[in-house]
Structure formats: C-alpha cells, structure tokens
A protein has these predicted regions:
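Ribonuclease/tRNase effector modules and their secretory precursors
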Residues: 1-142
C-alpha cells in the first residue's frame, strides 16, 4: 500500500474523492466549491493559514481539465492528476510566493500529457460563499 492509499483509508481525503467522482459523473452541485481538505502543513509553513479549508471552484476545475479547443486557456489535465492533488499538496517538490499578492505556487512531481511539470496556484484567504478559504486558482503544466 502506498502513502496515498493510506491517507484515503484513514479517511482524510475520502470526501474529496467522493466529490471528484460526482464531478466526473455529472451529479455534483456546480454552485458549490469542492473542498479538498484543510490547508496542508506544507502550505502553512509557506504562509497559508492552516485553520482554513483548501478548495477549488468548479469553474477552475473545468478550465484545468478542459481542452484549449473547448475552453479558453484549457489545460487538459487528466483525472489522475486531479485525484492526486491533495497528496501532492501534502508534500510538494517546492513552494514559492507568486507574483500575485497573497498567492503561492506549488510545484508537484506530476506531469501533464506533454511531460511538463504540474504547478498549482493557491490564492490565500479568499472569500468564497461567505467563508474565508485558501482557494486553488489554477492548476496547469508548465
């Protein structure tokens, strides 16, 4: 059993995986963000508030998996990358401050279909449906 499976078995990301399944089978509430979990220690060490949930909006997820032919600036990431997201944010290769204020960039060890490393942009302390969260604002290969 790998570390990812152990985390799932412990229930830490079970709700996230259920939401991703609903997203892909079309039964998710598209008006609500997907909750990945609490902000990871790695992000907290880099300046994120660890008491906040980490989320991704459906619109952002659509852009991340969409084809550039179908969605403006679609990133065409496959489902496996989306499913690995929480685990990659637990232990990213590197985190640095983005040029955007109140934002971090996480470098993962995942690769997109073109062989580019996958990066995750996290906007810190964002208001989302009247709650403050740390929100994934983009996920792409570069």
């Amino acid at each position: 059993m790998n570390d990812n499976q152990e985390l799932i078995l412990k229930g830490r990301y079970t709700a996230y995986m259920e939401q991703i399944e609903k997203y892909y089978n079309g039964t998710i509430d598209r008006t609500q963000p997907i909750v990945i979990g609490m902000t990871t220690n790695a992000l907290a060490i880099s300046g994120a508030d660890s008491s906040l949930e980490l989320t991704i909006n459906i619109k952002t997820l659509n852009k991340c998996i969409g084809s550039p032919d179908d969605i403006y600036h679609g990133h065409l990431l496959d489902r496996n990358i989306i499913e690995q997201l929480p685990f990659q944010l637990e232990n990213p290769v590197m985190i640095f401050k983005n040029t955007e204020k109140h934002s971090l960039i996480c470098i993962t060890d995942l690769q997109d279909s073109s062989g580019h490393g996958v990066m995750v942009a996290v906007a810190l302390e964002q208001i989302n449906h009247q709650h403050t969260v740390n929100r994934i604002s983009s996920l792409y290969g570069k």
